[in-house]
Amino acid sequence: MNLSQYLTPLEDEMRAVVAPLAESSPALLYGMLRYHLGWADEAFHPVQVYAGKRLRPCFLLLACEAQGGPWREALPAAAAIELLHNFTLIHDDIEDHDARRRGRPTLWTLWGVPQAINAGDALFALAYRAMLRLDAGPLPPDRILLALRRYSKAILYITEGQCFDLAFEAQEEVAETPYLQMIERKTAVLLGLACELGGLLAGAA
């Protein structure tokens, strides 16, 4: 098993979603997205820096391949999972007042909270755009629609998990049951979705 085989095609797919917009206005918005994804520095000059382990999209592609599916056909969904994950990180940094992410200043510390919120919203929309690129491949429409339904359901779970997490900050003690509900939704849901979508797109029931 070699997950590294997925990384370059995944990066290419993500860039195919984001890069065409990077030359459009407003340059600040797409510059911030490129910065957060590790493709640009603070002046928006091209760089390539550490941008995370990419575990979730790799799990999706691995699950697809394990079920006998052509993993390259699932690349749009893998890119969507990673873009969605990064959307949650942008908003999480704001909500938790985190000043650094992956060794660099976070978006809100550089460009302010309102711009960072807006950049996160844009990344959320781009994640859906990535999912819709499945329609350009050979996958049957009913399978793509089911994948979109599972994807949307998972996003709601993520927001529920974040609600728990934020509420816990005001509590001195947290009971076991709500804590498990929080980590199930906030931490586990994207990993589970990645594996589920990989199998689903390969044709598994």
PLM feature spans:
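Inter-helical turn/loop segments and adjacent helix faces that build the functional surface
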Residues: A66-P70, A130-L148, D165-M182, E196-A205
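A glycine/threonine-rich phosphate-anchoring loop and its flanking beta-alpha core
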Residues: L110-W111, I117, D121-L139, R149
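Divalent-cation-assisted or electrostatically stabilized phosphate/pyrophosphate-binding catalytic cores
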Residues: Q48, R101-L123, E172-T187
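Residue-level signal for inorganic ion chemistry
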Residues: F59, A127, G161
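Conserved N-terminal diphosphate/IPP-binding helix and adjacent helical/loop segment
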Residues: M1-A80, L84, I90, I94-T109, ...
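Short amphipathic alpha-helical segments with heptad-repeat character
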Residues: M1-S4, S152, E184
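Mid-bilayer segments of alpha-helical transmembrane spans in multi-pass integral membrane proteins
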Residues: P114, N118, A154, I158-Q162
